[in-house]
Amino acid sequence: LACSMAVGLMQINSGLNFFFGLPIDGVTVFAIAAIMVTVYVVSCLTGIKKGMRVLSSFCTIVFIGLMVYVLCLGPTRFIVDAGTESLGVFFNRFFEHSVILPTMAENETWSKSWIIMFMASFFVYAPIIGLFLARLGKGRTVREFIFMNIGAPTLFCIVWIAIWGGTTVWLQYTGIMDVWQSVNEKGLEVTIFTILSTLPFAKILAAFFIIAVFFSFSTMADSIT
Protein backbone atom coordinates (compact mmCIF):
# COMPACT_ATOMS: atom_id res chain seq x y z
CA LEU A 1 0.00 0.00 0.00
CA ALA A 2 2.84 2.38 0.87
CA CYS A 3 4.66 1.62 -2.41
CA SER A 4 1.46 2.14 -4.42
CA MET A 5 0.83 5.44 -2.68
CA ALA A 6 4.40 6.56 -3.35
CA VAL A 7 4.08 5.75 -7.06
CA GLY A 8 0.74 7.54 -7.22
CA LEU A 9 2.13 10.62 -5.48
CA MET A 10 5.08 10.74 -7.88
CA GLN A 11 2.79 10.49 -10.90
CA ILE A 12 0.31 13.08 -9.66
CA ASN A 13 3.03 15.55 -8.64
CA SER A 14 4.86 15.05 -11.94
CA GLY A 15 1.68 15.66 -13.92
CA LEU A 16 0.85 18.82 -11.99
CA ASN A 17 4.41 20.05 -12.55
CA PHE A 18 4.50 19.14 -16.25
CA PHE A 19 1.21 20.81 -17.22
CA PHE A 20 0.46 23.32 -14.49
CA GLY A 21 3.87 24.29 -13.12
CA LEU A 22 3.40 23.13 -9.53
CA PRO A 23 6.78 22.50 -7.87
CA ILE A 24 8.05 19.00 -7.16
CA ASP A 25 8.96 19.26 -3.49
CA GLY A 26 8.11 17.89 -0.09
CA VAL A 27 5.39 20.43 0.63
CA THR A 28 3.46 19.63 -2.56
CA VAL A 29 3.81 15.88 -2.04
CA PHE A 30 2.66 16.21 1.58
CA ALA A 31 -0.39 18.26 0.53
CA ILE A 32 -1.35 15.71 -2.13
CA ALA A 33 -0.87 12.86 0.34
CA ALA A 34 -3.01 14.61 2.96
CA ILE A 35 -5.88 15.10 0.50
CA MET A 36 -5.48 11.53 -0.76
CA VAL A 37 -5.65 10.07 2.75
CA THR A 38 -8.67 12.25 3.58
CA VAL A 39 -10.56 10.97 0.53
CA TYR A 40 -9.55 7.42 1.43
CA VAL A 41 -10.85 7.78 5.01
CA VAL A 42 -14.14 9.28 3.83
CA SER A 43 -14.52 6.47 1.29
CA CYS A 44 -13.95 3.87 4.02
CA LEU A 45 -16.43 5.48 6.40
CA THR A 46 -19.21 5.75 3.80
CA GLY A 47 -18.99 2.07 2.84
CA ILE A 48 -18.81 0.12 -0.40
CA LYS A 49 -22.22 1.09 -1.78
CA LYS A 50 -21.67 4.83 -1.37
CA GLY A 51 -18.16 6.26 -1.33
CA MET A 52 -16.26 3.45 -3.01
CA ARG A 53 -18.98 2.81 -5.59
CA VAL A 54 -19.10 6.48 -6.61
CA LEU A 55 -15.32 6.78 -6.88
CA SER A 56 -14.99 3.49 -8.77
CA SER A 57 -17.71 4.45 -11.24
CA PHE A 58 -16.09 7.83 -11.83
CA CYS A 59 -12.65 6.27 -12.43
CA THR A 60 -14.13 3.69 -14.79
CA ILE A 61 -15.87 6.37 -16.86
CA VAL A 62 -12.72 8.51 -17.01
CA PHE A 63 -10.42 5.64 -18.01
CA ILE A 64 -12.84 4.37 -20.67
CA GLY A 65 -13.26 7.94 -21.94
CA LEU A 66 -9.48 8.36 -22.19
CA MET A 67 -9.19 5.11 -24.13
CA VAL A 68 -11.92 6.06 -26.59
CA TYR A 69 -10.44 9.55 -27.04
CA VAL A 70 -6.93 8.25 -27.76
CA LEU A 71 -8.27 5.52 -30.04
CA CYS A 72 -10.31 7.98 -32.11
CA LEU A 73 -7.81 10.87 -32.28
CA GLY A 74 -4.63 8.81 -32.18
CA PRO A 75 -3.20 6.38 -34.77
CA THR A 76 -6.36 4.26 -34.89
CA ARG A 77 -5.26 1.87 -37.66
CA PHE A 78 -1.84 1.31 -36.08
CA ILE A 79 -3.40 0.70 -32.65
CA VAL A 80 -5.80 -1.93 -33.99
CA ASP A 81 -3.13 -3.69 -36.05
CA ALA A 82 -0.46 -3.63 -33.34
CA GLY A 83 -2.93 -4.64 -30.63
CA THR A 84 -4.20 -7.61 -32.63
CA GLU A 85 -0.68 -8.77 -33.49
CA SER A 86 0.59 -8.32 -29.92
CA LEU A 87 -2.33 -10.28 -28.49
CA GLY A 88 -1.53 -13.15 -30.84
CA VAL A 89 2.13 -13.12 -29.81
CA PHE A 90 1.12 -13.04 -26.14
CA PHE A 91 -1.07 -16.13 -26.42
CA ASN A 92 1.51 -17.90 -28.58
CA ARG A 93 4.33 -17.38 -26.03
CA PHE A 94 2.30 -17.37 -22.83
CA PHE A 95 3.40 -20.76 -21.50
CA GLU A 96 6.99 -20.23 -22.64
CA HIS A 97 7.28 -16.99 -20.71
CA SER A 98 5.41 -18.40 -17.72
CA VAL A 99 8.09 -21.01 -17.01
CA ILE A 100 11.21 -19.35 -18.43
CA LEU A 101 14.24 -19.30 -16.12
CA PRO A 102 17.85 -18.22 -16.76
CA THR A 103 19.09 -21.79 -16.35
CA MET A 104 21.94 -21.57 -18.84
CA ALA A 105 21.68 -17.97 -19.97
CA GLU A 106 22.98 -15.86 -17.12
CA ASN A 107 22.30 -12.63 -19.02
CA GLU A 108 18.64 -13.49 -19.58
CA THR A 109 16.69 -10.64 -18.02
CA TRP A 110 13.04 -11.52 -18.66
CA SER A 111 12.47 -13.50 -15.47
CA LYS A 112 14.59 -11.13 -13.39
CA SER A 113 13.00 -7.93 -14.66
CA TRP A 114 9.36 -8.99 -14.91
CA ILE A 115 8.34 -12.32 -13.47
CA ILE A 116 9.89 -11.85 -10.02
CA MET A 117 8.50 -8.33 -9.70
CA PHE A 118 5.01 -9.45 -10.70
CA MET A 119 5.06 -12.47 -8.40
CA ALA A 120 6.09 -10.30 -5.45
CA SER A 121 3.14 -7.99 -6.11
CA PHE A 122 0.77 -10.93 -6.50
CA PHE A 123 1.89 -12.49 -3.22
CA VAL A 124 1.23 -9.21 -1.41
CA TYR A 125 -2.12 -8.32 -2.98
CA ALA A 126 -3.69 -11.73 -3.69
CA PRO A 127 -4.76 -12.72 -0.15
CA ILE A 128 -6.22 -9.32 0.74
CA ILE A 129 -7.88 -8.63 -2.60
CA GLY A 130 -9.15 -12.22 -2.66
CA LEU A 131 -11.04 -11.64 0.59
CA PHE A 132 -12.46 -8.38 -0.77
CA LEU A 133 -13.65 -10.05 -3.99
CA ALA A 134 -15.19 -12.88 -1.97
CA ARG A 135 -17.11 -10.29 0.00
CA LEU A 136 -18.35 -8.67 -3.21
CA GLY A 137 -19.33 -12.07 -4.60
CA LYS A 138 -21.79 -12.80 -1.82
CA GLY A 139 -25.24 -13.37 -3.29
CA ARG A 140 -24.00 -13.64 -6.88
CA THR A 141 -23.75 -16.64 -9.17
CA VAL A 142 -20.42 -18.24 -10.07
CA ARG A 143 -20.86 -17.05 -13.66
CA GLU A 144 -21.40 -13.45 -12.57
CA PHE A 145 -18.44 -13.62 -10.20
CA ILE A 146 -16.06 -14.98 -12.86
CA PHE A 147 -17.18 -12.50 -15.50
CA MET A 148 -16.98 -9.40 -13.30
CA ASN A 149 -13.74 -10.29 -11.50
CA ILE A 150 -11.81 -12.08 -14.24
CA GLY A 151 -13.42 -11.57 -17.64
CA ALA A 152 -14.21 -7.85 -17.58
CA PRO A 153 -10.89 -6.73 -15.97
CA THR A 154 -8.91 -8.90 -18.38
CA LEU A 155 -10.72 -7.45 -21.39
CA PHE A 156 -10.19 -3.92 -20.06
CA CYS A 157 -6.45 -4.52 -19.59
CA ILE A 158 -6.10 -5.93 -23.12
CA VAL A 159 -7.79 -2.90 -24.67
CA TRP A 160 -5.97 -0.43 -22.38
CA ILE A 161 -2.53 -1.86 -23.17
CA ALA A 162 -3.33 -2.07 -26.89
CA ILE A 163 -4.41 1.58 -27.10
CA TRP A 164 -1.74 3.19 -24.93
CA GLY A 165 1.02 0.78 -25.92
CA GLY A 166 0.17 1.14 -29.60
CA THR A 167 0.14 4.93 -29.35
CA THR A 168 3.49 4.93 -27.55
CA VAL A 169 5.13 2.65 -30.12
CA TRP A 170 3.69 4.74 -32.96
CA LEU A 171 5.10 7.97 -31.49
CA GLN A 172 8.52 6.36 -31.15
CA TYR A 173 8.37 4.68 -34.58
CA THR A 174 7.34 7.80 -36.49
CA GLY A 175 9.82 10.04 -34.67
CA ILE A 176 7.11 12.38 -33.38
CA MET A 177 8.37 11.80 -29.86
CA ASP A 178 11.36 10.00 -28.40
CA VAL A 179 9.54 8.05 -25.70
CA TRP A 180 12.60 6.10 -24.61
CA GLN A 181 14.59 9.30 -24.10
CA SER A 182 11.76 10.71 -22.01
CA VAL A 183 11.79 7.58 -19.83
CA ASN A 184 15.54 7.81 -19.29
CA GLU A 185 15.68 11.55 -18.66
CA LYS A 186 12.37 12.32 -16.94
CA GLY A 187 11.24 8.97 -15.56
CA LEU A 188 8.23 6.74 -16.10
CA GLU A 189 5.96 8.95 -14.00
CA VAL A 190 6.38 11.85 -16.45
CA THR A 191 6.32 9.89 -19.71
CA ILE A 192 2.55 9.37 -19.70
CA PHE A 193 2.09 13.14 -19.59
CA THR A 194 4.57 13.73 -22.41
CA ILE A 195 2.50 11.28 -24.44
CA LEU A 196 -0.69 13.14 -23.54
CA SER A 197 0.96 16.40 -24.63
CA THR A 198 0.95 15.14 -28.24
CA LEU A 199 -2.86 14.96 -28.28
CA PRO A 200 -5.43 17.76 -28.65
CA PHE A 201 -6.67 19.34 -25.39
CA ALA A 202 -3.71 17.85 -23.54
CA LYS A 203 -4.21 19.85 -20.34
CA ILE A 204 -7.84 18.76 -20.02
CA LEU A 205 -6.85 15.14 -20.58
CA ALA A 206 -4.07 15.45 -18.02
CA ALA A 207 -6.46 16.92 -15.45
CA PHE A 208 -8.90 14.02 -15.83
CA PHE A 209 -6.05 11.51 -15.76
CA ILE A 210 -4.58 12.99 -12.56
CA ILE A 211 -7.98 12.99 -10.85
CA ALA A 212 -8.58 9.37 -11.91
CA VAL A 213 -5.17 8.28 -10.58
CA PHE A 214 -5.91 10.15 -7.36
CA PHE A 215 -9.25 8.42 -6.82
CA SER A 216 -7.90 5.05 -7.99
CA PHE A 217 -5.57 4.94 -5.01
CA SER A 218 -8.48 5.61 -2.66
CA THR A 219 -10.54 2.77 -4.11
CA MET A 220 -7.55 0.41 -4.07
CA ALA A 221 -6.72 1.25 -0.46
CA ASP A 222 -10.38 0.99 0.51
CA SER A 223 -10.60 -2.53 -0.94
CA ILE A 224 -7.80 -3.89 1.26
CA THR A 225 -8.99 -2.40 4.55
Predicted features along the sequence, with ranges:
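Select transmembrane alpha-helical segments in multipass membrane proteins
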Residues: 1, 30-38, 62-73, 107-113, ...
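Transmembrane-helix bundle segments that line or gate the permeation/cavity pathway
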Residues: 1-18, 29-32, 42, 71-74, ...
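Membrane-interface loop-to-helix entry segments
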Residues: 3, 46-72, 82-92, 147-153
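Membrane-helix boundary/coupling elements in multi-pass transport proteins
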Residues: 3-13, 127-149, 203-225
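Membrane-water interface regions at transmembrane-helix termini and the short interhelical loops
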Residues: 14-19, 36-58, 74, 129-142
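Transmembrane alpha-helical segments of multi-pass small-molecule transport proteins
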Residues: 20-46, 65, 119-131
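Extracellular/periplasmic helix-exit of transmembrane alpha-helices
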Residues: 70-93, 154-186
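Membrane-interface interhelical connector segments
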Residues: 92-108, 166-203
